[in-house]
């Protein structure tokens, strides 16, 4: 990953962590940690690695909650990075 990609990935990770901690009210997404963000070369797709504190049995409900909140999260990332086209967010456990 190039330096600009790395910088944007770090910013996305920080923004998503803050959003999940403070602004998302879905109880399925409590105690979810963003562990890494990887961008493709064109910065159109972001693969976000997440983990939930607690047990692995929450994986399905956490992924369902993230899928439901994906539009909100992408819009907020776009606003906070001040870019027109935020990368598409793909969450992985």
Where are these regions (language model features)?
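Charge-rich, low-complexity N-terminal segments
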Residues: 1-46, 51-93
